[in-house]
Amino acid sequence: MPRIKQTEKSYFCYMTENRRLQAEKIISVIILVLLSAIYIACICARAKAAASPKPDFTVVIDAGHGGIDGGVSGIKSGVKESELNLDISRKLKTVFEKSGAKAVLTRKTEAGLYGIFSKGFKKRDMKKRMEIAERASPDVFVSIHLNYYSSSSRRGAQVFYKIGSEKSEKLAISVQNQLNALQNKNYAPLPGDFYVLNESSGEAILCECGFLSNEEDEAMLLTDEYRQKIAETIFVGIETYRYGLATGVN
């Protein structure tokens, strides 16, 4: 077996060591690139989070009725309360979202929340609404409805609040004040024994936005412009309460 000369052996060792060092450099570069990529990704994620802060206020908007339960009907047009409730609720949601708040609808379409229509559908519908509301952990819960009364002369909006809740009463006062100003009325908010209010964990109100038994209220509520005003007025009332600017009933 031929013997490897010392110079050849040294050269071989040199080449082996050189390759090892080159491999280590390549691995170091790869690790550096990966760490840099991770660092940049973290910076981008933080920047994105800072640019899109989590909303610090959540409102759940409950459009009353829906599906087989259309609510009351317009005295002249026959329009279903559920349709107008949903439109006002959608408008209110849009206004809140434009302000940077999070707004959640319990009902997004004309369908009810009771599943298959059968005995006990109303109770299932109400329970589903509250499940949606509780998952959202809202600061405020507001249910949108329209009223009906035996006397067709009665008109204007009426706000109800969760019984035994001082904060809900103050919220109702603030919203009622704004609606009174819009409709030139002087109503005071009332305690309301309603399932959606009783089952709410926080501040909760129910807004009867007008009387479909009154032709003037009905005619206004049939216009998109007035429904937008109603939504904006409720928004202002809630925001006034939120920032501690509400006073007594005007």
PLM features per residue range, with description:
Residues 1-24:
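N-terminal Lys/Arg-rich, disordered targeting/topogenic segments
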Residues 2-4, 84, 101:
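Extracytoplasmic glycan-interaction modules
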Residues 6-9, 34, 189:
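Alpha-helical structural elements
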Residues 16-30, 37-54, 79, 86-250:
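Active-site-proximal helix/loop segments of hydrolytic enzymes
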Residues 57-78:
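Short glycine-rich His-centered loop
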